[in-house]
């Protein structure tokens, strides 16, 4: 507990579960789980899918669906998280910034043909499906490589 003008030094998974349970009790259908760097001295552990354990704990202990976020960069990671029951949905930011067609390409790669593509993208849909049939692997990263700009010297 804290009072006005105090800083929370430690916020545990158990605290998050208690808050999620209270939100569920007041009608929340799903909890978006994201741990942010909210203070200058925060030093969170950062790595691949680093916030998924938080979503999983809340999902299991508060018995409420969760949305996982945090350095989830591929369709394979998403499928693993969902199939393992670690979260109910995944939120992506950088992968969609790097590739606005991330979801459409992943659908083609996995052979999910009912995915609706906007009319202007239909030729890309055909190409993506043909490439998937020919065995091309689909990979997406959240931070695409950008070649350095040559010096003007």
PLM region spans:
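Flavin-dependent oxidoreductase catalytic cores
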Residues: 1-153
